[in-house]
Amino acid sequence: TNGLGGYSSLSVIGSLARGDQALLMSAQKAPNVRRHLISNLLETFSMDGTDYVLTSQRMMNQPDLEGFRYLDSFSYDKIPTWTYRIGDVVISKRMVMVHGENTVALQYNIHSEQKHQCRLTLTPMLRFSPKKEEFCEKQQITVNIEQDNLYRIKGAEDVLYVAANAQIQEEPSHLFGPMYFSQDERDGREKQGRTVCTHSYISETETGEIQNDINVILSTKPYTYHEGLFDELLHSRQAYEEALLKKANLTSEIGRQLVLGADAYVVDRESTQGKSIIAGYPFFEDWGRYDDRTGRNYSGHRQTGRM
């Protein structure tokens, strides 16, 4: 979460099980006016001419995407990390959301001791709609190159900037889906949804050599790309969390995890220039103020030094 009401929420295998899950749900006005910018990335890895889809997603009327079959491990040690294995090639993906911004940064690394011709294609699954609303199929989305490695994607009401060390390839706009949201169907919510794809980011590399990481930064602000950008954003997040832990002054590992877990629900409230608490993700909004109705639920925030 980003402390504004925005969030990045995918399943352990990197799929969407609910329509309100998103790779980047931005907060237009903290914390309740939220925009669903990008649902996910369609990730395709090509090795020596053979394509492998790394994305996982249940679909309604077509075969499911089963990238989880190549998923070797998932870990969450401060940030989520997915590791895929195809033959002797290992593809790792790390992701971080910047606190106080509508920014998600991803870093891919492709490694093998053997020589292979590899290509990674990342296709944004764009939604560009208010949270809880469907994608408007009549919406026109344009893609412009702002400068080297910085791209501007504009919809009817939204602008998304992508800074990446990858080449852009535009394609005819087409709908992706419908996707099947199994958890929503169980709860009686809308069980399907679509996104739109207009372009891809492509990076080609040869394994067995010194390799650069593939970095993709998705944001509502334009970042000038440089090779250390992902690390800067990661260190920014880590510094914020270290400050929280220092303030809480807890020594037990469980207590320190509680500090970071509780922080996910503390958000800015723009209308009062103060803080509020989100009742839960991805459905709920904030309680707006502290009162007797909700006070019994604040014990975790008292214990972690957030009150």
Regions found by a protein language model. Give the residues of each.
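Terminal accessory carbohydrate-recognition/targeting modules of carbohydrate-active enzymes
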Residues: T1-L250, T304-M307
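Solvent-exposed loop and edge beta-strand segments that line ligand/cofactor-binding
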Residues: K93, C197-I202, K275-D291
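Conserved oxyanion/phosphate-binding beta-strand-loop segments in alpha/beta enzyme cores
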Residues: Y240-G280
